[in-house]
Amino acid sequence: MKKITINDLMTWKHEGRKFASITAYDASFAQLFEQQEVPVLLVGDSLGMVLQGKPDTLPVSVSDIAYHTRCVRAGSPNTLLMADMPFMSYSTPEQACESAAELMRAGANMVKLEGGAWLAETITKLTERAVPVCAHLGLTPQSVNIFGGYKVQGRDSDHAAQMVKDAILLKNAGAQIILLECVPASLAERITKAVEVPVIGIGAGNVTDGQILVMHDMFGISANYMPRFSKNYLAETGDMRTAVSKYLEEVEAGTFPGPQHTFE
């Protein structure tokens, strides 16, 4: 697989070509994903739940993400690699730059931050310092205690309108990817059309430019439960490589996620 860059994702958006991405945490799975030509991988703070057995993502540290980023980069030299900025690692622009520097040195091509309009200054500071940014909107798991649980976001008109404004603001601040989690498909479509950068969805319908799944959900090995927006591809195929290929095919064809994986 040739080396994937943000320019490739931009081209695919303009061409209407959908793409898939997966979370990864170690070199072996990263290598498997690259061999199947998964273009984008994310070292997610979801590792706190799926690897460390924590109830949420809040205990994850920058050092945790950096360690797993090094592992994933070792196994996938050509994928576009995003790394999550953990809870309270970007409270100020200055702290964000320090945290991002550690993750970029570990091998990330881009960092992902959760939040809305308040992130604009931080995103600008990061991009001015050559750190590409993915802005995560909708259900932001680091805010689970504010939301009172893992709930669909943007169902009321005011919240939806604000999310569209936030996406445009953060794109204008320098974000090169927008990630939408657990939002109605109609809202995801509005945002995807409103911004010129690629939009990746998880629980946001098949209307976004790309999709992402947590690998443990995709392989049906999550310890607790299967989110509605996910799909156990391993159960359907019986083989991990075939499972990844089927996921890629269905995303590119627009058949995943289907209505049963989508919120309205």
UniProtKB/Swiss-Prot annotation:
Listed under GO biological process in this entry are: pantothenate biosynthetic process
Which SUPFAM superfamilies does the entry mention?
Answer: Phosphoenolpyruvate/pyruvate domain
Q: Does the keyword Endoplasmic reticulum apply?
A: no
Q: Where in the cell is it found?
A: Cytoplasm
What is the enzyme's class at the highest EC level? transferase
* A UniProt-annotated Pfam family: Pantoate_transf
Superkingdom of origin: Bacteria
Q: Which GO terms describe its cellular component?
A: cytoplasm
Q: Which cofactor does it need?
A: Mg(2+)
A Gene Ontology molecular-function term? magnesium ion binding
Which residues does 3-methyl-2-oxobutanoate bind?
A: D45, S46, D84, K112
| UniProt pathway annotation | Cofactor biosynthesis; (R)-pantothenate biosynthesis; (R)-pantoate from 3-methyl-2-oxobutanoate: step 1/2
Explain how, and how many, cofactor molecules are bound. Answer: Binds 1 Mg(2+) ion per subunit.
Task: Give the catalysed reaction(s), semicolon-separated.
Answer: 3-methyl-2-oxobutanoate + (6R)-5,10-methylene-5,6,7,8-tetrahydrofolate + H2O = 2-dehydropantoate + (6S)-5,6,7,8-tetrahydrofolate
Question: InterPro entries of this UniProt entry?
Answer: Pantoate_hydroxy_MeTrfase (IPR003700), Pyrv/PenolPyrv_kinase-like_dom (IPR015813), Pyrv_kinase-like_dom_sf (IPR040442)
Q: Which residues form the active site?
A: E181 (proton acceptor)
Q: Which UniProt keywords apply?
A: Cytoplasm, Magnesium, Metal-binding, Pantothenate biosynthesis, Transferase
Instruction: Relate the protein's function as given in its record.
Output: Catalyzes the reversible reaction in which hydroxymethyl group from 5,10-methylenetetrahydrofolate is transferred onto alpha-ketoisovalerate to form ketopantoate.
Query: Known HAMAP family for this protein?
Result: PanB
> Could you identify this protein by its name?
3-methyl-2-oxobutanoate hydroxymethyltransferase
